[in-house]
């Protein structure tokens, strides 16, 4: 039905204590047309040096996409095709970009951080 593609982002917290403000993701949800580019941003909990990206398609559990320690991308899933890229400059926030979106990209994209 139409050419709209729905990409959702949600919050996932690992190792947060009561004083932490939590992981922040932006945008929280995004609806786009096939063929467009989408960029998601994740701001981890302060002082957390590990950051993870996951995606969850309808009716499935979360699937690992990539893992950073500080700015180094230490592990990358085969699910990250040449249209997907992630970076974490200076070990701070992280971005996940999907180029030329396809119907199969419709999912909830999650980020998490830990010590």
From Swiss-Prot:
One of its GO terms (cellular component) is T cell receptor complex. Its main location: membrane. GO terms for molecular function: MHC protein binding; peptide antigen binding. One of its GO terms (biological process) is adaptive immune response. InterPro entries: Ig-like_dom, Ig-like_dom_sf, Ig-like_fold, Ig_V-set, TCR_beta_variable. It comes from the Eukaryota. The keyword Disulfide bond applies. Residues 22-115 form the Ig-like domain. Alpha-beta TR is a heterodimer composed of an alpha and beta chain; disulfide-linked. The alpha-beta TR is associated with the transmembrane signaling CD3 coreceptor proteins to form the TR-CD3 (TcR or TCR). The assembly of alpha-beta TR heterodimers with CD3 occurs in the endoplasmic reticulum where a single alpha-beta TR heterodimer associates with one CD3D-CD3E heterodimer, one CD3G-CD3E heterodimer and one CD247 homodimer forming a stable octameric structure. CD3D-CD3E and CD3G-CD3E heterodimers preferentially associate with TR alpha and TR beta chains, respectively. (Microbial infection) Interacts with Staphylococcus aureus enterotoxins A/entA and H/entH. V region of the variable domain of T cell receptor (TR) beta chain that participates in the antigen recognition. Alpha-beta T cell receptors are antigen specific receptors which are essential to the immune response and are present on the cell surface of T lymphocytes. Recognize peptide-major histocompatibility (MH) (pMH) complexes that are displayed by antigen presenting cells (APC), a prerequisite for efficient T cell adaptive immunity against pathogens. This is T cell receptor beta variable 7-9. It comes from Homo sapiens (Human). The lineage of its organism: Eukaryota, Metazoa, Chordata, Craniata, Vertebrata. The gene is TRBV7-9.
């Amino acid at each position: 039905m139409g050419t709209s593609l729905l990409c959702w982002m949600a919050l996932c917290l690992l190792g947060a204590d009561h004083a932490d403000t939590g992981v922040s993701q932006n945008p929280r949800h995004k609806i786009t047309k096939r063929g467009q580019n989408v960029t998601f941003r994740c701001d981890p909990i302060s002082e957390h040096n590990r950051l993870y990206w996951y995606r969850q398609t309808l009716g499935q559990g979360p699937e690992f996409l990539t893992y950073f320690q500080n700015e180094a991308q230490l592990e990358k899933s085969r699910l990250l095709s040449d249209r997907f890229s992630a970076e974490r400059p200076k070990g701070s926030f992280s971005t996940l970009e999907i180029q030329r979106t396809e119907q199969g990209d419709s999912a909830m994209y999650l980020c998490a951080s830990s010590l």
